[in-house]
Design a protein with these regions (language model features):
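N-terminal domain-onset segments
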Residues: 1-41, 111-202
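An exposed acidic His-Trp-rich patch
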Residues: 50-137, 141
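Extracytoplasmic c-type cytochrome modules immediately beyond a signal peptide or single-pass transmembrane anchor
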Residues: 4-64, 68-69, 77-84, 88-89
Length: 202
């Protein structure tokens, strides 16, 4: 038997939505499998579903508010808050009892995520192009309701019910620098040519 320690350590399964950092209308379902690496850092691999033939579509790092506030301003542009994803009920932990899920999200509500998708599966059935920066929703009226309804039916969950159950979760003040798109401008990756450095190690 081959040991697969990182895979075995992925103890958390989450489902939510991501939007492309430069286009709110492009929202996709994201299935996360996460490791709690340190007290202030989670790392997740992201698939398009929780199925045997699921496509690997990206990664996300999740950090504490304290760690986020310590980041350089330029780095903060890459991060999004999780407050609305938690409070709205959009982010869910399928199969976890409500009490345990509530406790988990009470901690997650103050965290920040940096997400890149490597497969634009909303457009192509192949991982073309370069990784794209993704963001999270931050308010009512932004989410693709058809996408949420389809997700809820498939997973047997109720976003509205989860929203009601999480009404008592306190939302901390959002740290400056996150969710840059809310100010009208954002950042995104792009492919460009550059000179190749032929310097060798020796």
């Amino acid at each position: 038997m081959q040991p697969k320690y990182p895979l075995e350590a992925m103890s958390t399964y989450l489902n939510g939505l991501h939007m492309y950092a430069d286009e709110m209308g492009r929202q996709v379902e994201a299935t996360h499998f996460c490791i709690h690496l340190r007290h202030d850092l989670h790392q997740c691999v992201i698939f398009d579903s929780n199925a045997p033939d699921a496509r690997l579509i990206g990664i996300e790092y999740i950090i504490s508010e304290e760690r986020f506030r310590s980041l350089p301003d330029k780095e903060k542009q890459l991060w999004h808050s999780h407050h609305y994803e938690v409070k709205s009920g959009i982010l869910t932990a399928p199969g976890v009892p409500e009490t345990a899920e509530h406790a988990y999200f009470s901690d997650l509500v103050s965290t920040y995520g940096k997400t890149f998708h490597t497969w634009q599966y909303d457009r192509d059935d192949f991982p073309y192009g370069i990784p794209q920066l993704m963001m999270g929703l931050t308010g009512d009226g932004q989410a693709d309701e058809d996408l949420i309804r389809a997700r809820d039916r498939r997973l047997g969950v109720s976003t509205q019910r989860k929203r009601e159950n999480r009404a008592d979760i306190h939302v901390p003040k959002i740290a400056p620098g996150a969710n840059p798109w809310e100010g009208g401008q954002t950042v995104q990756t792009r492919l460009e040519k550059m000179d190749f450095n032929r310097h060798t190690v020796n």
